[in-house]
């Protein structure tokens, strides 16, 4: 299924958009997602970051994969409807950057 509201970006477009995000963002192995790992002190802060990402995602209507553990929270965006990256992934990543710095 192709999502015409958020078409799949070309690799060059995605690379350009990635360069505008916090330096912590990187392409995942297959290039079909972007990911940022945020280091923090302790488990409670990792849970807080995960909840912050989840709350923000719910308000945006674009939900990342979020993993966390003691001292870290990882957020991964992709657009499943296009089997790759869309503008929405980069907008959501930029908004996450604004939240966590």
Question: For the regions a protein language model found, what residue spans apply to each?
Answer:
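Long, contiguous binding/interaction regions
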Residues: 1-35, 41-101
């Amino acid at each position: 299924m192709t999502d015409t509201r958020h078409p799949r970006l070309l690799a060059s477009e995605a690379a350009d958009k990635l360069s505008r995000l916090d330096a912590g963002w990187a392409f995942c192995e297959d290039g079909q997602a972007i990911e940022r790992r945020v280091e923090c002190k302790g488990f409670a802060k990792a849970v807080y970051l995960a909840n912050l990402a989840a709350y923000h995602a719910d308000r945006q209507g674009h939900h990342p994969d979020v993993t966390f553990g003691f001292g870290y929270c990882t957020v991964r965006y992709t657009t499943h409807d296009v089997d790759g990256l869309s503008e929405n992934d980069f907008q959501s990543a930029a908004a996450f950057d604004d939240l966590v710095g």
